[in-house]
Amino acid sequence: MADPEKQGPAESRAEDEVMEGAQGGEDAATGDSATAPAAEEPQAPAENAPKPKNDFIESLPNPVKCRVLALKKLQKRCDKIEAKFDKEFQALEKKYNDIYKPLLAKIQELTGEMEGCAWTLEGEDDEDDEEEEDEEEEEEEAAAGATGGPDSAEK
């Protein structure tokens, strides 16, 4: 694929389109805004500074540049399709939500509020009493600790 003589006509046309976009075609206006200021600023030679994105792409061989730019175009197309899918999916959800509303209202009407139960579990009352006693003891300890009573010094 790297050799232009071995490429088919479709591949060479795609490369031509991509190269036109890279050289200021229709995609130049919609390109990354981050790369534009980097091209305008003068480059100071710094050994430890990372190369800007633009220099990295320029350092690649032409066939690789073409592939990168073609992949960028394809990704933009995928993003547009995905946005369209999301929009249609939301519309579909809204449509079926409207259909479900009457059914959900009937279910809510039938179930209504929880009705009281005449019976209780055997150990349920004992557990409630123990929990209340524990809470009261904790409150007393907290109150004694806050006032600095004799109980707080012992613990």
Swiss-Prot record:
Keywords: Coiled coil, Nucleus. Residues 27-49 have a biased composition (Low complexity). Residues 1-16 have a biased composition (Basic and acidic residues). The keyword Nucleus applies. InterPro entries: NAP-like_sf, NAP_family. It is found in: Nucleus. It comes from the Eukaryota. One of its GO terms (cellular component) is nucleus. The keyword Coiled coil applies. Its main location: nucleus. One of its GO terms (biological process) is nucleosome assembly. Residues 1-60, 119-155 are annotated as: Disordered. Residues 68-94 form a coiled coil. Belongs to the nucleosome assembly protein (NAP) family. This is Nucleosome assembly protein 1-like 5.
